[in-house]
Amino acid sequence: MGFLRFGRESAPPPTVQSDTIIPFHYWDDDHHTRGLSFDVTFRVDDILDPEKLRCALSRLLELGDWRKLGARIRRNAEGGLEYHVPQCFDDKRPGFAYSTVAYDMNVADHPQASRLAQPHYLDAAGRPAVQDTTYTATPEFRSFIRTPAFPDRLEGWLRSDSPQLGVRIITFLDATLVTVSFLHSLTDMMGLDAVLDAWSAVLRGREDEVKSFVGFAHDPLAGLTESKTEPLQKYVFADTLLLGWTWFWFALRYIVTIELFWQHREEERVIFLPAKHLQQMRSKAMAELTARGAHDSDTPLFVSEGDVLFAWWTRVVLRAEKPDPSRTVNMRNTYCCRSILAELGHIPSATCALVTNAVFATLTFLSVRQVLEEPLGFTAFEIRKSLIQQRNAEQLQALDRIQRKTLDNAHHPALFGNPSMYTVMMSNWVKAKLFQVDFSAAVIRKGMATGKRSNQLGRPSCIQGTGTKGYATRNTGVVIGKDAAGNFWLLYSLRKEIWPAVEQQLLSMSLDDAA
Protein backbone atom coordinates (compact mmCIF):
# COMPACT_ATOMS: atom_id res chain seq x y z
CA MET A 1 0.00 0.00 0.00
CA GLY A 2 2.47 2.57 -1.24
CA PHE A 3 -0.28 5.21 -1.30
CA LEU A 4 0.11 5.50 2.48
CA ARG A 5 3.72 6.65 2.15
CA PHE A 6 5.05 10.15 1.81
CA GLY A 7 8.45 11.54 1.04
CA ARG A 8 10.37 14.58 -0.17
CA GLU A 9 11.67 14.81 -3.71
CA SER A 10 14.73 16.62 -5.03
CA ALA A 11 14.25 19.55 -7.38
CA PRO A 12 13.65 18.37 -10.97
CA PRO A 13 15.79 19.47 -13.93
CA PRO A 14 14.65 22.67 -15.68
CA THR A 15 11.89 22.34 -18.27
CA VAL A 16 13.02 22.25 -21.89
CA GLN A 17 10.73 24.67 -23.72
CA SER A 18 10.65 22.64 -26.94
CA ASP A 19 9.40 19.48 -25.17
CA THR A 20 5.83 18.34 -25.76
CA ILE A 21 4.07 18.14 -22.38
CA ILE A 22 1.43 15.43 -21.96
CA PRO A 23 -0.44 14.57 -18.74
CA PHE A 24 -0.19 10.96 -17.64
CA HIS A 25 -3.17 8.79 -18.53
CA TYR A 26 -5.39 8.20 -15.50
CA TRP A 27 -4.42 4.58 -14.82
CA ASP A 28 -0.73 5.21 -15.54
CA ASP A 29 -0.62 7.74 -12.68
CA ASP A 30 -1.62 5.19 -10.04
CA HIS A 31 0.14 4.26 -6.78
CA HIS A 32 0.60 0.70 -8.05
CA THR A 33 2.24 1.65 -11.35
CA ARG A 34 4.29 4.47 -9.81
CA GLY A 35 5.72 2.16 -7.17
CA LEU A 36 6.94 -0.69 -9.38
CA SER A 37 9.76 -0.84 -11.91
CA PHE A 38 10.58 -3.80 -14.14
CA ASP A 39 13.81 -5.33 -15.41
CA VAL A 40 12.77 -7.94 -17.98
CA THR A 41 15.71 -10.08 -19.11
CA PHE A 42 15.54 -12.19 -22.27
CA ARG A 43 18.06 -14.99 -22.68
CA VAL A 44 18.71 -15.74 -26.36
CA ASP A 45 20.88 -18.76 -27.17
CA ASP A 46 22.66 -16.92 -29.95
CA ILE A 47 25.18 -14.10 -30.15
CA LEU A 48 23.38 -10.90 -31.11
CA ASP A 49 24.82 -7.70 -32.56
CA PRO A 50 24.25 -5.00 -29.90
CA GLU A 51 24.73 -2.18 -32.39
CA LYS A 52 22.01 -3.49 -34.69
CA LEU A 53 19.63 -3.69 -31.76
CA ARG A 54 20.52 -0.18 -30.59
CA CYS A 55 20.15 1.37 -34.04
CA ALA A 56 16.79 -0.33 -34.62
CA LEU A 57 15.34 0.95 -31.35
CA SER A 58 16.74 4.43 -32.01
CA ARG A 59 15.08 4.42 -35.42
CA LEU A 60 11.76 3.30 -33.94
CA LEU A 61 11.70 6.38 -31.71
CA GLU A 62 11.99 8.53 -34.85
CA LEU A 63 8.80 7.08 -36.34
CA GLY A 64 5.73 9.22 -35.63
CA ASP A 65 4.41 9.17 -32.08
CA TRP A 66 6.77 6.39 -31.02
CA ARG A 67 8.99 9.16 -29.66
CA LYS A 68 6.76 9.14 -26.57
CA LEU A 69 8.85 6.17 -25.39
CA GLY A 70 11.69 8.65 -24.87
CA ALA A 71 9.66 10.98 -22.65
CA ARG A 72 10.97 12.33 -19.37
CA ILE A 73 8.80 12.18 -16.23
CA ARG A 74 7.92 15.34 -14.31
CA ARG A 75 5.45 16.33 -11.61
CA ASN A 76 3.11 19.24 -12.37
CA ALA A 77 1.93 22.00 -10.05
CA GLU A 78 -1.12 19.95 -8.99
CA GLY A 79 1.04 17.00 -7.97
CA GLY A 80 0.14 14.81 -10.94
CA LEU A 81 2.68 13.22 -13.26
CA GLU A 82 3.26 14.35 -16.81
CA TYR A 83 5.49 13.46 -19.74
CA HIS A 84 7.98 15.87 -21.27
CA VAL A 85 8.65 14.47 -24.75
CA PRO A 86 11.74 15.79 -26.58
CA GLN A 87 11.21 16.85 -30.19
CA CYS A 88 14.22 14.75 -31.16
CA PHE A 89 16.93 12.72 -29.47
CA ASP A 90 20.71 13.08 -29.44
CA ASP A 91 23.71 12.09 -27.35
CA LYS A 92 22.82 14.69 -24.72
CA ARG A 93 19.16 13.62 -24.46
CA PRO A 94 18.94 10.04 -25.81
CA GLY A 95 15.65 8.28 -26.41
CA PHE A 96 16.64 5.44 -24.09
CA ALA A 97 19.44 4.60 -21.68
CA TYR A 98 21.81 2.07 -23.21
CA SER A 99 24.83 0.01 -22.30
CA THR A 100 26.51 -3.14 -23.54
CA VAL A 101 29.29 -5.43 -22.39
CA ALA A 102 30.88 -8.58 -23.85
CA TYR A 103 32.30 -11.50 -21.88
CA ASP A 104 34.76 -14.02 -23.32
CA MET A 105 33.09 -16.93 -21.53
CA ASN A 106 29.91 -18.97 -21.49
CA VAL A 107 26.88 -17.95 -19.44
CA ALA A 108 27.43 -20.83 -17.01
CA ASP A 109 30.93 -19.55 -16.19
CA HIS A 110 29.91 -16.02 -15.20
CA PRO A 111 29.37 -15.48 -11.44
CA GLN A 112 26.12 -13.53 -11.92
CA ALA A 113 24.71 -14.87 -15.20
CA SER A 114 25.12 -18.46 -14.00
CA ARG A 115 22.59 -17.78 -11.24
CA LEU A 116 19.78 -17.19 -13.74
CA ALA A 117 17.43 -20.08 -14.50
CA GLN A 118 18.92 -22.72 -16.81
CA PRO A 119 16.06 -23.41 -19.23
CA HIS A 120 17.56 -26.32 -21.15
CA TYR A 121 18.52 -28.19 -17.99
CA LEU A 122 15.04 -27.70 -16.52
CA ASP A 123 13.34 -28.74 -19.76
CA ALA A 124 15.47 -31.89 -20.01
CA ALA A 125 14.77 -32.80 -16.38
CA GLY A 126 11.02 -32.39 -16.93
CA ARG A 127 10.26 -31.78 -13.25
CA PRO A 128 8.49 -28.85 -11.54
CA ALA A 129 11.06 -26.66 -9.83
CA VAL A 130 11.38 -23.60 -7.61
CA GLN A 131 14.37 -21.29 -7.97
CA ASP A 132 15.48 -18.77 -5.39
CA THR A 133 15.76 -15.21 -6.75
CA THR A 134 16.96 -13.33 -3.66
CA TYR A 135 20.29 -12.79 -5.43
CA THR A 136 18.56 -10.45 -7.91
CA ALA A 137 18.34 -7.78 -5.20
CA THR A 138 22.10 -7.77 -4.54
CA PRO A 139 24.14 -4.77 -5.76
CA GLU A 140 26.41 -7.12 -7.72
CA PHE A 141 23.57 -8.59 -9.74
CA ARG A 142 21.72 -5.32 -10.31
CA SER A 143 24.87 -3.60 -11.56
CA PHE A 144 25.45 -6.56 -13.87
CA ILE A 145 21.95 -6.77 -15.39
CA ARG A 146 20.95 -3.06 -15.52
CA THR A 147 22.25 -0.05 -17.44
CA PRO A 148 24.50 1.94 -15.05
CA ALA A 149 22.87 4.91 -13.27
CA PHE A 150 19.46 4.13 -14.76
CA PRO A 151 16.68 4.90 -12.22
CA ASP A 152 14.73 2.12 -10.55
CA ARG A 153 12.27 4.25 -8.55
CA LEU A 154 9.97 7.12 -9.52
CA GLU A 155 12.06 9.59 -7.50
CA GLY A 156 15.06 8.76 -9.68
CA TRP A 157 13.22 9.70 -12.85
CA LEU A 158 11.78 12.87 -11.31
CA ARG A 159 15.13 14.26 -10.21
CA SER A 160 16.94 13.42 -13.44
CA ASP A 161 16.51 13.88 -17.16
CA SER A 162 16.53 10.13 -17.69
CA PRO A 163 14.38 8.58 -20.43
CA GLN A 164 11.77 5.98 -19.49
CA LEU A 165 13.45 2.99 -21.14
CA GLY A 166 16.74 1.38 -20.26
CA VAL A 167 18.36 -1.33 -22.41
CA ARG A 168 21.31 -3.48 -21.37
CA ILE A 169 22.82 -6.02 -23.81
CA ILE A 170 25.31 -8.58 -22.49
CA THR A 171 26.96 -11.01 -24.90
CA PHE A 172 28.66 -14.29 -24.03
CA LEU A 173 30.26 -16.98 -26.16
CA ASP A 174 27.05 -19.03 -26.17
CA ALA A 175 24.19 -16.58 -25.54
CA THR A 176 23.02 -12.99 -25.22
CA LEU A 177 21.08 -11.35 -22.39
CA VAL A 178 18.85 -8.42 -23.34
CA THR A 179 17.34 -6.52 -20.40
CA VAL A 180 14.60 -3.93 -20.88
CA SER A 181 14.00 -1.73 -17.81
CA PHE A 182 11.10 0.68 -17.24
CA LEU A 183 8.72 2.08 -14.65
CA HIS A 184 5.34 0.32 -14.66
CA SER A 185 3.65 3.68 -15.34
CA LEU A 186 4.92 3.43 -18.92
CA THR A 187 2.92 0.35 -19.85
CA ASP A 188 1.59 -3.07 -19.01
CA MET A 189 2.99 -6.24 -20.61
CA MET A 190 0.74 -6.10 -23.68
CA GLY A 191 2.16 -2.62 -24.29
CA LEU A 192 5.69 -3.99 -23.91
CA ASP A 193 4.77 -6.62 -26.49
CA ALA A 194 3.78 -3.82 -28.88
CA VAL A 195 7.15 -2.12 -28.31
CA LEU A 196 9.07 -5.36 -28.89
CA ASP A 197 7.09 -6.15 -32.05
CA ALA A 198 7.80 -2.69 -33.47
CA TRP A 199 11.49 -2.92 -32.50
CA SER A 200 11.73 -6.30 -34.21
CA ALA A 201 10.05 -4.99 -37.38
CA VAL A 202 12.56 -2.14 -37.69
CA LEU A 203 15.38 -4.61 -36.99
CA ARG A 204 14.19 -6.75 -39.93
CA GLY A 205 14.08 -3.71 -42.20
CA ARG A 206 10.27 -3.76 -42.30
CA GLU A 207 9.27 -0.31 -41.11
CA ASP A 208 6.06 -0.76 -43.10
CA GLU A 209 5.02 -3.36 -40.50
CA VAL A 210 5.39 -0.94 -37.57
CA LYS A 211 1.93 -0.12 -36.27
CA SER A 212 0.94 3.45 -35.51
CA PHE A 213 1.44 4.42 -31.88
CA VAL A 214 -1.96 4.79 -30.18
CA GLY A 215 -2.64 7.10 -27.24
CA PHE A 216 0.14 9.67 -27.62
CA ALA A 217 -1.84 12.44 -25.90
CA HIS A 218 -5.39 11.08 -25.72
CA ASP A 219 -6.20 8.55 -22.98
CA PRO A 220 -8.14 5.68 -24.64
CA LEU A 221 -9.49 4.62 -21.24
CA ALA A 222 -11.04 8.03 -20.60
CA GLY A 223 -14.82 8.13 -20.87
CA LEU A 224 -15.34 4.42 -20.22
CA THR A 225 -18.38 5.22 -18.10
CA GLU A 226 -20.16 6.78 -21.07
CA SER A 227 -22.20 3.63 -21.60
CA LYS A 228 -23.97 2.90 -24.86
CA THR A 229 -27.07 1.97 -22.92
CA GLU A 230 -28.62 3.59 -19.88
CA PRO A 231 -28.66 3.08 -17.01
CA LEU A 232 -25.10 1.90 -16.51
CA GLN A 233 -25.02 -1.76 -15.48
CA LYS A 234 -24.32 -2.43 -11.81
CA TYR A 235 -20.94 -3.96 -11.03
CA VAL A 236 -21.44 -7.54 -9.87
CA PHE A 237 -19.59 -7.02 -6.56
CA ALA A 238 -20.65 -3.41 -5.96
CA ASP A 239 -22.39 -4.32 -2.70
CA THR A 240 -19.15 -5.72 -1.25
CA LEU A 241 -17.09 -2.54 -1.75
CA LEU A 242 -15.03 -1.90 1.37
CA LEU A 243 -15.80 1.58 2.66
CA GLY A 244 -15.56 3.32 6.01
CA TRP A 245 -14.82 0.97 8.87
CA THR A 246 -14.67 -2.13 6.63
CA TRP A 247 -11.91 -0.60 4.54
CA PHE A 248 -10.18 0.69 7.66
CA TRP A 249 -10.22 -2.79 9.22
CA PHE A 250 -8.84 -4.39 6.06
CA ALA A 251 -6.15 -1.70 5.76
CA LEU A 252 -5.21 -2.12 9.42
CA ARG A 253 -4.83 -5.89 9.02
CA TYR A 254 -2.75 -5.33 5.90
CA ILE A 255 -0.46 -2.74 7.48
CA VAL A 256 0.05 -4.65 10.72
CA THR A 257 0.54 -8.11 9.21
CA ILE A 258 2.36 -7.21 6.01
CA GLU A 259 3.75 -3.68 5.84
CA LEU A 260 5.07 -3.57 9.42
CA PHE A 261 6.06 -7.19 10.04
CA TRP A 262 6.16 -9.27 6.88
CA GLN A 263 7.43 -7.06 4.04
CA HIS A 264 11.08 -7.86 4.69
CA ARG A 265 10.27 -11.52 5.22
CA GLU A 266 8.65 -12.15 1.85
CA GLU A 267 10.59 -13.74 -0.97
CA GLU A 268 10.04 -13.88 -4.69
CA ARG A 269 10.91 -17.04 -6.57
CA VAL A 270 10.68 -18.50 -10.06
CA ILE A 271 8.45 -21.55 -10.57
CA PHE A 272 9.03 -23.83 -13.55
CA LEU A 273 6.06 -26.02 -14.52
CA PRO A 274 6.72 -28.52 -17.33
CA ALA A 275 4.18 -28.70 -20.14
CA LYS A 276 3.15 -32.28 -19.38
CA HIS A 277 2.11 -31.46 -15.82
CA LEU A 278 -0.25 -28.66 -16.82
CA GLN A 279 -1.63 -30.76 -19.67
CA GLN A 280 -2.38 -33.57 -17.24
CA MET A 281 -4.04 -31.21 -14.76
CA ARG A 282 -6.20 -29.64 -17.46
CA SER A 283 -7.27 -33.02 -18.85
CA LYS A 284 -8.20 -34.15 -15.35
CA ALA A 285 -10.09 -30.91 -14.69
CA MET A 286 -12.13 -31.31 -17.87
CA ALA A 287 -12.91 -34.92 -16.93
CA GLU A 288 -14.02 -33.80 -13.45
CA LEU A 289 -16.35 -31.20 -14.92
CA THR A 290 -17.89 -33.72 -17.27
CA ALA A 291 -18.40 -36.23 -14.47
CA ARG A 292 -20.03 -33.63 -12.22
CA GLY A 293 -22.28 -32.28 -14.93
CA ALA A 294 -20.94 -28.77 -14.50
CA HIS A 295 -22.17 -27.67 -17.91
CA ASP A 296 -25.11 -25.27 -17.95
CA SER A 297 -26.81 -23.23 -20.65
CA ASP A 298 -24.94 -20.02 -19.84
CA THR A 299 -21.38 -21.23 -19.38
CA PRO A 300 -19.70 -23.57 -21.91
CA LEU A 301 -17.93 -26.59 -20.48
CA PHE A 302 -14.40 -25.30 -20.83
CA VAL A 303 -11.40 -24.31 -18.72
CA SER A 304 -8.24 -22.85 -20.19
CA GLU A 305 -4.64 -23.56 -19.25
CA GLY A 306 -4.67 -20.21 -17.45
CA ASP A 307 -7.76 -21.15 -15.41
CA VAL A 308 -6.20 -24.44 -14.32
CA LEU A 309 -2.84 -22.84 -13.60
CA PHE A 310 -4.39 -20.20 -11.33
CA ALA A 311 -6.60 -22.77 -9.56
CA TRP A 312 -3.63 -25.09 -9.00
CA TRP A 313 -1.36 -22.34 -7.72
CA THR A 314 -4.04 -21.00 -5.35
CA ARG A 315 -4.35 -24.49 -3.88
CA VAL A 316 -0.55 -24.76 -3.53
CA VAL A 317 -0.42 -21.44 -1.66
CA LEU A 318 -3.32 -22.30 0.65
CA ARG A 319 -1.87 -25.71 1.50
CA ALA A 320 1.39 -24.02 2.46
CA GLU A 321 -0.11 -21.03 4.27
CA LYS A 322 -2.89 -22.96 6.08
CA PRO A 323 -5.47 -20.19 6.65
CA ASP A 324 -8.72 -20.97 8.50
CA PRO A 325 -10.89 -23.25 6.28
CA SER A 326 -13.91 -20.98 6.70
CA ARG A 327 -12.06 -17.89 5.53
CA THR A 328 -12.97 -16.31 2.19
CA VAL A 329 -10.39 -16.46 -0.59
CA ASN A 330 -10.35 -13.60 -3.09
CA MET A 331 -8.70 -14.85 -6.28
CA ARG A 332 -7.78 -11.72 -8.21
CA ASN A 333 -7.05 -12.43 -11.86
CA THR A 334 -5.96 -9.51 -14.07
CA TYR A 335 -6.98 -9.23 -17.71
CA CYS A 336 -6.17 -6.94 -20.63
CA CYS A 337 -9.13 -4.80 -21.71
CA ARG A 338 -7.86 -3.86 -25.20
CA SER A 339 -10.48 -5.99 -26.97
CA ILE A 340 -13.23 -4.22 -25.00
CA LEU A 341 -11.73 -0.81 -25.80
CA ALA A 342 -11.83 -1.76 -29.47
CA GLU A 343 -15.44 -2.94 -29.13
CA LEU A 344 -16.37 0.44 -27.63
CA GLY A 345 -14.52 2.32 -30.36
CA HIS A 346 -11.85 3.77 -28.06
CA ILE A 347 -8.96 2.24 -30.06
CA PRO A 348 -8.71 1.07 -33.71
CA SER A 349 -8.34 -2.64 -32.88
CA ALA A 350 -7.49 -5.02 -30.06
CA THR A 351 -4.04 -5.59 -31.58
CA CYS A 352 -3.08 -1.96 -32.13
CA ALA A 353 0.08 -0.52 -30.55
CA LEU A 354 -1.44 0.82 -27.34
CA VAL A 355 1.43 1.48 -24.93
CA THR A 356 -0.27 2.19 -21.61
CA ASN A 357 -1.77 0.36 -18.64
CA ALA A 358 -5.04 -1.22 -19.75
CA VAL A 359 -5.61 -4.00 -17.23
CA PHE A 360 -8.42 -4.68 -14.79
CA ALA A 361 -9.23 -7.61 -12.54
CA THR A 362 -11.85 -10.31 -12.35
CA LEU A 363 -12.61 -11.61 -8.87
CA THR A 364 -13.53 -15.12 -7.77
CA PHE A 365 -14.69 -15.62 -4.18
CA LEU A 366 -14.58 -19.09 -2.63
CA SER A 367 -13.86 -20.43 0.84
CA VAL A 368 -10.49 -21.92 1.73
CA ARG A 369 -12.28 -25.21 2.32
CA GLN A 370 -13.74 -25.23 -1.21
CA VAL A 371 -10.38 -24.63 -2.86
CA LEU A 372 -8.68 -27.34 -0.80
CA GLU A 373 -11.40 -29.99 -0.78
CA GLU A 374 -13.21 -29.62 -4.09
CA PRO A 375 -11.61 -31.07 -7.24
CA LEU A 376 -9.27 -28.76 -9.13
CA GLY A 377 -11.77 -28.62 -11.98
CA PHE A 378 -14.32 -26.98 -9.67
CA THR A 379 -12.06 -24.04 -8.82
CA ALA A 380 -10.85 -23.67 -12.41
CA PHE A 381 -14.46 -23.56 -13.64
CA GLU A 382 -15.37 -20.92 -11.05
CA ILE A 383 -12.48 -18.82 -12.35
CA ARG A 384 -13.73 -19.33 -15.91
CA LYS A 385 -17.27 -18.29 -14.96
CA SER A 386 -15.92 -15.15 -13.29
CA LEU A 387 -14.08 -14.22 -16.48
CA ILE A 388 -17.20 -14.68 -18.59
CA GLN A 389 -19.34 -12.73 -16.13
CA GLN A 390 -16.95 -9.81 -15.58
CA ARG A 391 -14.79 -9.49 -18.71
CA ASN A 392 -17.23 -7.51 -20.87
CA ALA A 393 -17.90 -3.88 -21.72
CA GLU A 394 -20.76 -3.37 -19.27
CA GLN A 395 -18.89 -4.74 -16.25
CA LEU A 396 -15.68 -2.95 -17.22
CA GLN A 397 -17.50 0.38 -17.40
CA ALA A 398 -19.19 -0.22 -14.05
CA LEU A 399 -15.93 -1.26 -12.37
CA ASP A 400 -14.01 1.67 -13.86
CA ARG A 401 -16.58 4.13 -12.52
CA ILE A 402 -16.36 2.69 -8.97
CA GLN A 403 -12.57 2.61 -9.02
CA ARG A 404 -12.23 6.21 -10.19
CA LYS A 405 -14.86 7.46 -7.74
CA THR A 406 -13.18 5.67 -4.83
CA LEU A 407 -9.72 6.94 -5.72
CA ASP A 408 -10.89 10.51 -6.32
CA ASN A 409 -13.10 10.75 -3.21
CA ALA A 410 -11.79 8.27 -0.64
CA HIS A 411 -8.17 8.45 -1.90
CA HIS A 412 -7.57 4.72 -1.74
CA PRO A 413 -8.03 1.85 -4.23
CA ALA A 414 -11.44 0.20 -4.52
CA LEU A 415 -11.41 -3.16 -2.74
CA PHE A 416 -14.21 -5.73 -2.79
CA GLY A 417 -14.96 -8.64 -0.46
CA ASN A 418 -14.77 -8.70 3.33
CA PRO A 419 -12.16 -7.29 5.73
CA SER A 420 -10.83 -10.70 6.76
CA MET A 421 -10.50 -12.22 3.29
CA TYR A 422 -7.34 -13.97 2.13
CA THR A 423 -6.16 -12.67 -1.25
CA VAL A 424 -4.24 -14.49 -3.97
CA MET A 425 -3.37 -12.40 -7.02
CA MET A 426 -2.09 -13.47 -10.42
CA SER A 427 -1.26 -11.55 -13.60
CA ASN A 428 -0.96 -13.73 -16.69
CA TRP A 429 1.49 -12.44 -19.32
CA VAL A 430 1.05 -15.35 -21.73
CA LYS A 431 -0.91 -13.27 -24.26
CA ALA A 432 1.97 -10.79 -24.39
CA LYS A 433 3.89 -13.53 -26.25
CA LEU A 434 7.21 -12.52 -24.72
CA PHE A 435 8.75 -15.88 -25.65
CA GLN A 436 8.02 -15.07 -29.31
CA VAL A 437 10.15 -11.92 -29.40
CA ASP A 438 12.17 -12.12 -32.62
CA PHE A 439 15.74 -10.81 -32.56
CA SER A 440 16.89 -13.14 -35.37
CA ALA A 441 17.83 -10.24 -37.66
CA ALA A 442 20.56 -9.31 -35.15
CA VAL A 443 22.09 -12.81 -34.88
CA ILE A 444 25.83 -12.91 -35.61
CA ARG A 445 26.17 -16.64 -35.00
CA LYS A 446 24.43 -19.47 -33.18
CA GLY A 447 25.26 -20.07 -29.55
CA MET A 448 23.55 -23.46 -29.48
CA ALA A 449 22.62 -25.79 -32.30
CA THR A 450 18.93 -25.41 -33.18
CA GLY A 451 18.52 -29.19 -32.97
CA LYS A 452 19.40 -29.10 -29.27
CA ARG A 453 16.80 -26.51 -28.26
CA SER A 454 13.12 -25.75 -28.62
CA ASN A 455 13.42 -21.99 -29.19
CA GLN A 456 14.02 -20.72 -32.71
CA LEU A 457 17.01 -18.69 -33.82
CA GLY A 458 17.04 -15.28 -32.13
CA ARG A 459 14.12 -16.05 -29.82
CA PRO A 460 14.36 -16.35 -26.02
CA SER A 461 14.66 -19.65 -24.19
CA CYS A 462 14.14 -18.01 -20.82
CA ILE A 463 12.73 -14.74 -19.48
CA GLN A 464 13.42 -13.47 -15.99
CA GLY A 465 11.47 -10.61 -14.43
CA THR A 466 13.02 -8.62 -11.61
CA GLY A 467 12.64 -5.05 -10.44
CA THR A 468 12.08 -2.66 -7.58
CA LYS A 469 8.91 -2.47 -5.49
CA GLY A 470 7.80 0.40 -3.30
CA TYR A 471 5.29 -1.73 -1.41
CA ALA A 472 4.77 -5.27 -0.17
CA THR A 473 3.79 -7.81 -2.84
CA ARG A 474 3.03 -10.88 -0.75
CA ASN A 475 0.67 -13.36 -2.44
CA THR A 476 1.18 -11.58 -5.75
CA GLY A 477 2.85 -12.81 -8.90
CA VAL A 478 2.83 -13.33 -12.63
CA VAL A 479 2.79 -16.05 -15.23
CA ILE A 480 5.80 -14.85 -17.23
CA GLY A 481 4.86 -16.96 -20.20
CA LYS A 482 4.85 -20.24 -22.05
CA ASP A 483 8.15 -21.15 -23.67
CA ALA A 484 8.70 -22.84 -27.02
CA ALA A 485 8.51 -26.30 -25.40
CA GLY A 486 5.17 -25.49 -23.77
CA ASN A 487 6.60 -25.12 -20.27
CA PHE A 488 5.18 -22.41 -18.00
CA TRP A 489 7.27 -19.93 -16.02
CA LEU A 490 5.89 -18.13 -12.96
CA LEU A 491 7.32 -15.48 -10.67
CA TYR A 492 5.65 -15.24 -7.26
CA SER A 493 6.08 -13.56 -3.87
CA LEU A 494 5.22 -15.40 -0.64
CA ARG A 495 6.21 -15.39 3.00
CA LYS A 496 9.75 -16.68 3.31
CA GLU A 497 8.68 -19.30 5.86
CA ILE A 498 6.24 -21.12 3.58
CA TRP A 499 8.45 -21.63 0.53
CA PRO A 500 9.75 -25.01 1.83
CA ALA A 501 6.13 -26.25 1.97
CA VAL A 502 5.60 -25.07 -1.61
CA GLU A 503 8.76 -26.83 -2.77
CA GLN A 504 7.63 -30.03 -1.05
CA GLN A 505 4.36 -29.97 -2.99
CA LEU A 506 6.21 -29.59 -6.29
CA LEU A 507 8.57 -32.41 -5.30
CA SER A 508 5.53 -34.61 -4.62
CA MET A 509 4.31 -33.91 -8.15
CA SER A 510 7.64 -35.18 -9.49
CA LEU A 511 7.53 -38.29 -7.31
CA ASP A 512 3.96 -39.04 -8.37
CA ASP A 513 5.03 -38.67 -11.99
CA ALA A 514 7.92 -41.08 -11.48
CA ALA A 515 5.79 -43.68 -9.68
From Swiss-Prot:
GO molecular function: acyltransferase activity
Catalyses which reaction(s): sphingofungin B + acetyl-CoA = sphingofungin C + CoA
Gene3D superfamilies, per the entry: Chloramphenicol acetyltransferase-like domain
Superkingdom field: Eukaryota
Phenotype caused by lack of the gene: Leads to an increased accumulation of sphingofungin B.
Active site (record annotation): 184 (proton acceptor), 438 (proton acceptor)
Metabolic or biological pathway, per its Swiss-Prot or TrEMBL entry: Secondary metabolite biosynthesis
Keywords, comma-separated and alphabetical: Acyltransferase, Transferase
Applied biotechnology uses: The sphingofungins A, B, C, and D, show a limited antifungal spectrum of activity but are especially effective against Cryptococcus species, fungal pathogens causing opportunistic infections in human.
EC class name: transferase
Upregulation: Expression is positively regulated by the sphingofungins biosynthesis cluster-specific transcription factor sphG.
Family note: Belongs to the plant acyltransferase family.
Quaternary assembly: Monomer.
Protein role: Acetyltransferase; part of the gene cluster that mediates the biosynthesis of sphingofungins, bioactive molecules acting as sphingolipid inhibitors via inhibiting serine palmitoyl transferase (SPT). SphE can also convert sphingofungin B1 into sphingofungin C1 and sphingofungin B2 into sphingofungin C2.
Name used for this protein in its record: Acetyltransferase sphE
Species in which this protein is naturally found: Aspergillus fumigatus (strain CBS 144.89 / FGSC A1163 / CEA10)
Gene transcribed to yield this protein: sphE
